[in-house]
Amino acid sequence: MNATAWQDCTFTSADGLRLYYRDYPCAVPGRLPVLCLPGLTRNCRDFESTALRLQRSRRELSPDLRGRGGSQHDPDFRNYHPGTYVADLALLLRHAGVERVVLIGTSLGGILSMLIAATSPQVAAGAILNDVGPEVAQAGLQRISSYVGRHTPVASWEEAAAQMRSMYGVAMPDATAADWMA
């Protein structure tokens, strides 16, 4: 265990990739663990503060999906797909010795949570969804595809704030210039 109270763990996917997750153990036995699933371009670190709070009363697992964070890159772009991610997560749970979880998912992680609940209801005790719902509008998908993987280097904080505003401003129309710089 490291100084921040989690264990760095890896498991092997069905197609041989080394995939990473953080395991935040809990001293209280018998409570349902939580599986926290990040958004499209995010990783397990998004849930660190949540996990540290949850750890007082339950175990928490946070993966880096394939090709992100500490997980190995998949050379086959067709495997960056929700069905593949769900299969990877089933192997993660088996590796961690977990049969049933409460899911917390942000954006893509919320979609994966819904897929797990629909395809493996015996695994999903409940779900908390953030930044996603049962329907995803085509306009939202087009907006996301317009900026994912297209970040350009910036020379100043002002340029960085402008880039963030161009990508996320539609979701936060009331944010001021000072908010984007914060």
Named regions from a protein language model:
Residues 1-19:
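N-terminal cap/lid segment of alpha/beta-hydrolase-fold proteins
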Residues 16, 30, 56, 97-100, ...:
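Active-site acidic short loop of glycosyltransferases
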Residues 17-75:
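Conserved HGGG/HGGXW glycine-rich cap/lid loop of the alpha/beta-hydrolase fold
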Residues 49-52, 56, 91-94, 118-122, ...:
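Short, well-ordered alpha-helices that flank and scaffold nucleotide-derived cofactor binding pockets
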Residues 49-52, 62-104:
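Active-site loop/oxyanion-hole signature of alpha/beta-hydrolase fold enzymes
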Residues 99-138:
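Conserved hydrolase catalytic core segment
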Residues 124, 130-159:
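A catalytic-pocket lid/entrance helix-loop region that shapes and gates access to the active site
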Residues 155-182:
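Conserved alpha/beta-hydrolase catalytic His-Asp/Glu region
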